[in-house]
Design a protein with these regions (language model features):
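Active-site-adjacent structural elements in enzyme catalytic cores
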Residues: 1-179
Length: 179
């Protein structure tokens, strides 16, 4: 499936379709404030395992991040001291990932050997609308090939061509930032 959304005003019906796919255990590709990302509901173990297969990584070795809806949502999944909270408050939403110690509320399949989790609150209304409607964080991992940023990671039509048989939904939110 392929859905075109406008970042400034994503269609609510389309956001609900995306959440329906996620609730059914689907994997999506969506825009962030940097490049496009692959994601799923962090509470769906099978979906997380599918993302691991797609990225050809073992869950215990994965360095996954998740997108939270706001700073108050983070404390349930990561240990945040006052200093880190102040830094996050100054810099989020934005193109940053904060790697923090994981709490035991994080699903086991998301916890790596170092027991850390990357936390993001991107400055992108599409993905933030999805997370808000989903009601819990979204697993996020970059759409990239061997740590090399290439055109297909920022062009939603090329992403769709490459991944349409591997994921359940690609969201076209315009060209990515290639950051």
């Amino acid at each position: 499936m392929y859905i075109k959304l406008f970042e400034d005003n994503p269609n609510t019906r389309d956001i609900l379709k995306v959440v329906e796919v996620l609730n059914a255990g689907g994997i999506i590709i969506y825009p962030t404030d940097t490049i496009y990302a692959i994601g799923c509901d962090i509470n769906n173990v099978k979906a997380v395992q599918r993302v691991c297969q797609l990225k050809n990584i073992k869950p215990e070795k994965a360095n996954f991040s998740m997108i939270c809806r706001d700073l108050s949502n983070i404390a349930a999944y990561a240990k945040v001291n006052n200093e880190v909270f102040k830094v996050m408050k100054r810099n989020l939403p934005g193109p940053f990932t904060f790697v923090l110690p994981a709490t035991n509320k994080l699903p086991n399949v998301m916890i790596n050997r170092r027991k850390t989790i990357g936390i993001r609150i991107p400055d992108n209304y599409i993905v933030m609308s999805i997370v808000e409607e989903l009601g819990n964080p979204l697993l996020t991992t970059s759409v990239k090939a061997e740590d090399e940023v290439v055109e297909y990671m920022t062009d939603p039509e090329l992403i769709h061509e490459k991944y349409e048989k591997l994921v359940d939904l690609v969201i076209d939110g315009g060209f990515g930032q290639n950051v």
